[in-house]
Design a protein with these regions (language model features):
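Bacterial N-terminal signal peptides
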Residues: 11-21
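Non-catalytic extracellular/lumenal accessory regions of secreted precursors
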Residues: 255-288, 296-298, 310, 316-321, ...
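Catalytic Zn2+-binding segment of zinc metalloproteases
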Residues: 158-177, 213, 222-226
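Noncatalytic modules at the cell exterior or secretory-pathway interfaces
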Residues: 286-288, 330-347
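Metalloprotease/metallohydrolase-associated module, dominated by Zn2+-dependent proteases
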Residues: 181-265
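Edge beta-strands of jelly-roll/beta-sandwich modules across compartments, strongly enriched
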Residues: 301, 343-357
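Short pre-active-site segment immediately N-terminal to the catalytic Zn-binding motif
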Residues: 137-155, 202-205
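Auxiliary, metal-adjacent structural segments of Zn-dependent hydrolase domains
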Residues: 73-133
């Protein structure tokens, strides 16, 4: 399961953060079906060293009103609003209705939302922060601040909450993004090329796929709400979502990836059978791959994972028991492989099971 994490959304009064990211992403611009809006001189970025911590939240000099609130959907959300905000402008019920109107799953019932003034938010999240999230607690303003609406902040932070409750082994969704979106965005291969930096809330914030996921979720939900204006200010344009990425994001929210799939098959090697058994392996998602093989007694069969070109050997299974062989590997952008079994020693039946993301 994803581990607890902290995120803070803050304002930077310069565009230096994105300068490096724009250069790094130039090679990726051609693949985008849509174009991100131009980034203004005021970019959004994370503030270093100011994560949401329970102690800071508890110590904040803020009086809250509200609590568990049942909305028109029948769902209950725990919303607390600062007394410093006028009741007519920021009621717990209003924000609870907004939250249950977001694209969401069952994770919404685990969330506690604190809506305050900008001063309240910055006393909890940091002096430049517009919002923050950690461990099922979300802090956001109830008023527009520096041209950023509270809805925009809440959508971004709720994206982190979704990732907190999604699984993407062998990685953590909150840093890499949920599985389907991360696969479409080729996060694994980008990390290997030093083009993405999971969990980096500092100088590589704009290339942090966890933040790119949160922004993709925000944009996806804004489109669902009929908002046509597009803003993409805090993450590298190389992560600006295609239609395929938006569809994958929606699926990650509404139909979360749950577990790997295991399939098994067998083949009998005899004196007149083919000397090599090839088995095609489809890998539509990135993640962990395992091959288990049971060979005949007295057999030392070669069980290899081979790339789609039929030539490159990715790895070979090793004995883990008298007749059992195993291979663990990672799928990182490859959409298919082959399992190649070559008999050595005693002939007979070989059983192969594959576990894919």
């Amino acid at each position: 399961m994803p581990h607890p994490t902290s995120r803070a959304l803050a304002v930077l009064l310069a565009s230096t953060l994105l300068a490096g990211a724009l250069a790094a992403s130039a090679a990726h611009g051609a693949r985008r079906a849509l174009s991100p809006p131009l980034t203004s001189a005021r970019a959004l970025a994370v503030e270093l060293g100011t994560p949401l911590r329970a102690a800071r939240l508890a110590a904040a000099d803020v009086t809250w009103r509200g609590g568990p609130t049942t909305t028109s959907t029948g769902e209950t959300v725990n919303v607390l609003v600062s007394d410093a905000l006028p009741p007519e402008a920021a009621s717990p019920s209003r924000w609870a209705e907004f939250l249950t109107g977001l694209t969401h799953g069952s994770e919404i019932s685990d969330l506690t939302v604190y809506v305050g003034t900008l001063d309240d938010v910055q006393s909890i999240c940091g002096q430049n922060a517009l919002g923050c999230y950690a461990s099922d607690q979300l802090v956001a303003p109830g008023e527009t601040a520096v041209d950023v609406s509270p809805e925009e902040v809440i959508r971004h932070e709720y994206g982190h909450h979704i990732a907190q409750h999604r699984s993407n082994p062998p990685w953590t969704s909150v840093e890499w993004g949920p599985k389907r979106w991360a696969t479409v965005e080729n996060v694994c291969a980008r990390v290997a090329r030093n083009e993405a930096y999971p969990g980096d809330e500092g100088s590589n914030y704009a290339l942090n796929p966890g933040e790119a996921w949160a922004e993709t979720y925000r944009l996806m939900d804004e489109r669902k709400a009929g908002i046509t204006a597009v803003s993409w200010r805090i993450v590298s344009p190389s992560f600006f979502p295609t239609e395929q990425a938006l569809e994958a994001a929606q699926q990650d929210v509404l139909q979360p990836w749950a577990a790997p799939e295991t399939t098994s098959t067998s083949h009998v090697f005899g004196k007149r059978s083919a000397k090599v058994w090839w088995m095609r392996l489809s890998t539509p998602l990135d993640g962990s791959l395992r091959i288990n093989a049971t060979v005949p007694v007295g057999g030392t069969y070669d069980v290899a994972l081979v790339s789609a070109n039929h030539r490159t050997v990715v790895g070979r299974a090793q004995f883990v028991g008298q007749r059992a062989k195993r291979l663990d590997a990672s799928v990182c952008g490859q959409r298919s492989f082959f399992v190649r079994v070559t008999p050595k020693g005693a002939l007979g039946r070989v059983r192969v099971s594959t576990t894919t993301p």
